[in-house]
Amino acid sequence: IKCHNTPLPFIYKTCPEGNNLCFKGTLKFPKKITYKRGCADACPKTSALVKYVCCNTDKCN
């Protein structure tokens, strides 16, 4: 799977074996700014400050 790995949506990398999810972390405050993107084996947990969304197709984050 290929995932974006910077806050900018046009830079991506091929994920290592076992990392079959892409994630996007968005700051909840002040304005839903994209904070972090990358590969994961499990979806990171949403916290008080960051909302994570995961998906499993190329460049879906």
From Swiss-Prot:
- Identify its protein family: Belongs to the three-finger toxin family. Short-chain subfamily. Orphan group XV sub-subfamily.
Fetch the PROSITE patterns from UniProt.
SNAKE_TOXIN (PS00272)
Which GO cellular component terms, listed alphabetically, does the Swiss-Prot or TrEMBL entry include?
extracellular region; membrane; other organism cell membrane
Gene3D superfamilies named in the record = CD59 (2.10.60.10)
Entry-linked Pfam families:
Toxin_cobra-type (PF21947)
Provide this UniProt record's keywords sorted from A to Z.
Disulfide bond, Membrane, Secreted, Target cell membrane, Target membrane, Toxin
Q: What is this protein called?
A: Cytotoxin homolog 3
Q: Could you tell me what this protein does?
A: Has low cytotoxic activity.
Main location group: secreted
Q: Which organism is it from?
A: Naja melanoleuca (Forest cobra)
Where it sits in the cell: the answer is: Secreted; Target cell membrane
Q: Is Membrane one of the keywords? A: yes
Q: In which tissues is it expressed?
A: Expressed by the venom gland.
MF terms from GO for this chain are:
toxin activity
Protein origin, superkingdom: Eukaryota
Has keyword Chaperone? no
> Which cysteine-cysteine pairs are annotated as disulfide bonds in the entry?
C3-C22, C15-C39, C43-C54, C55-C60
